[in-house]
Amino acid sequence: MLSCSDQPDPHAQLIGGGGYSKYLVAQGQWLGKLNNNRNKKIPFNFEVKKDSIFIINSEERIGARISIYKDSLRVKIPVFDSELRFIKTKDGLRGYWHNNTKTNQKLLFHAFLNPKGQKNRFNVGKNNTYSLYSGNWETTFSKGTKNEYKSLAIFHQEGEFATGTFITETGDYRYLQGNVCNDSIFLSCFDGAHAFLFEGSLIDNVIHGVFYSGLQWSEPWVSFKNDSFALTNPYLLTQKVSRERLEFTFPNIDGGNLSYPDKRFHNKVVIIQIFGSWCPNCVDETKFLAGLYDRYQDRGLEIIGLAFESPKKLSDKIARVKDLKSHTGSKYEFLIAGNASKKEAQNALPWLNEVSSFPTTIFVDKKGHIRKIHTGFYGPGTGEHYAKYTAEVDALIEGLLNE
């Protein structure tokens, strides 16, 4: 039970951090670790090519540049206001991950070369008699407390290697990667916005685990296999308040204001996206909506992104959203609607009964009537759930455009 550990540092191989190279960091595969204050290490894989780093989470690759910053090196994570700052040592790399969206949030970071490019993030040992975890698991986080919530865990296992995610009613935990060791499963993710670690042990067909996030957050979770389990329909969670009119005016990112309704949107199908650039699920959705807009804009589709951002100054909020727009190649309209708060989003949009998730997506027909509201987003890390949802949206837009 929980007998595995993170991959031990093979100090004899730690030659990549301090040796001579024409590049800032030695080339090849690396294994990084972030230390939280619960005495846990959150491992992640990355590859260095020239002066670029590619953070690896299962099928995902997040590229960023390595640069010189004062007396150290820095990797600024795209879109998210976070960065790795580190120095080279004879043993590898050592420094901190700074999450600037959270006050005083920094985690110790160290990394060592992984010359064989092995996928294992955790030490599975030589005599691993692994349990079988593949399948769908009905999951409850913080069971028996006021913070209890349901989730669908999806695990894929090939021998000792495991990937998967947890889907909730507000989104998903994106690409998780790790290992199975005897009766235990270990999964982790680092994407620049979050650092996640899931540990679980299979006891009498039930997984008992703990979820760690960032510097100090943790909560228990319990799962049992249930291929028929489904979460609440995400189209039923958020509703329009019937007495309130769908309307708003917010500043755009080009120095003006934009309103809905407006003659620009007359006889157009409109998607209204409630999001924040700090939210990985929102970034996943923005990439999807960018492609949707490219396909349907000339047929009468408009998309308006309502951003709720962390910085206090409007200029800083605009800068964050412009960064997201550039990173995703999005060509649709973005407005600054307020601060990064569900309560503030609710107050800014009184025609909704609540805003329980970033993102929340509203589909409006040519007559200005709300036809559907989708709470959360099932990103590409959810596999068939993402494929199903994106196909549903395509069909919905086709139907609305043809009306």
Please provide the spans of the model-predicted regions.
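Surface-exposed beta-loop interaction hotspot
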Residues: 103-141, 233-239, 245-248
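Short active-site neighborhood of thiol/selenol oxidoreductases, capturing the structured segment around
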Residues: 258-283, 289
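Structural micro-motif
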Residues: 329-333, 352-362
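N-proximal helix/coil linker or "cap" segments that precede and/or mark the start of modular domains
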Residues: 212-251, 256, 263-267
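C-terminal motif of bacterial Sec signal peptides marking the signal peptidase cleavage site
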Residues: 2-3
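Thiol-/selenol-based redox modules, centered on thioredoxin-like
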Residues: 357-403
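Structural microenvironment flanking redox-active thiols in thiol-disulfide oxidoreductases
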Residues: 284-329, 340-348
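Central antiparallel beta-sheet cores of small beta-barrel/beta-sandwich binding domains
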Residues: 13-20, 24-89, 122-123, 128-202
